[in-house]
Amino acid sequence: MARPNPNKQVVELNRTSLYFGLLLIFVLAVLFSSYIFN
């Protein structure tokens, strides 16, 4: 509770990794759907 800065950095890192994972899943879904429809 005395040092909230490392916790804030960890939360931001988890948030960016979550967004990167969602973006990767979205790209894979688009490529997979285009592969199916073509």
From Swiss-Prot:
<dbReference type="GO" id="GO:0009535">
    <property type="term" value="C:chloroplast thylakoid membrane"/>
</dbReference>
<dbReference type="GO" id="GO:0015979">
    <property type="term" value="P:photosynthesis"/>
</dbReference>
<keyword id="KW-0934">Plastid</keyword>
<keyword id="KW-1133">Transmembrane helix</keyword>
<keyword id="KW-0150">Chloroplast</keyword>
<feature type="transmembrane region" description="Helical">
    <location>
        <begin position="17"/>
        <end position="37"/>
    </location>
</feature>
<keyword id="KW-0604">Photosystem II</keyword>
<keyword id="KW-0812">Transmembrane</keyword>
<keyword id="KW-0793">Thylakoid</keyword>
<dbReference type="Pfam" id="PF02419">
    <property type="entry name" value="PsbL"/>
</dbReference>
<comment type="function">
    <text>One of the components of the core complex of photosystem II (PSII). PSII is a light-driven water:plastoquinone oxidoreductase that uses light energy to abstract electrons from H(2)O, generating O(2) and a proton gradient subsequently used for ATP formation. It consists of a core antenna complex that captures photons, and an electron transfer chain that converts photonic excitation into a charge separation. This subunit is found at the monomer-monomer interface and is required for correct PSII assembly and/or dimerization.</text>
</comment>
<comment type="similarity">
    <text>Belongs to the PsbL family.</text>
</comment>
<keyword id="KW-0602">Photosynthesis</keyword>
<keyword id="KW-0674">Reaction center</keyword>
<comment type="subunit">
    <text>PSII is composed of 1 copy each of membrane proteins PsbA, PsbB, PsbC, PsbD, PsbE, PsbF, PsbH, PsbI, PsbJ, PsbK, PsbL, PsbM, PsbT, PsbX, PsbY, PsbZ, Psb30/Ycf12, at least 3 peripheral proteins of the oxygen-evolving complex and a large number of cofactors. It forms dimeric complexes.</text>
</comment>
<dbReference type="GO" id="GO:0009539">
    <property type="term" value="C:photosystem II reaction center"/>
</dbReference>
<dbReference type="InterPro" id="IPR037266">
    <property type="entry name" value="PSII_PsbL_sf"/>
</dbReference>
<keyword id="KW-0472">Membrane</keyword>
<protein>
    <recommendedName>
        <fullName>Photosystem II reaction center protein L</fullName>
    </recommendedName>
</protein>
<dbReference type="InterPro" id="IPR003372">
    <property type="entry name" value="PSII_PsbL"/>
</dbReference>
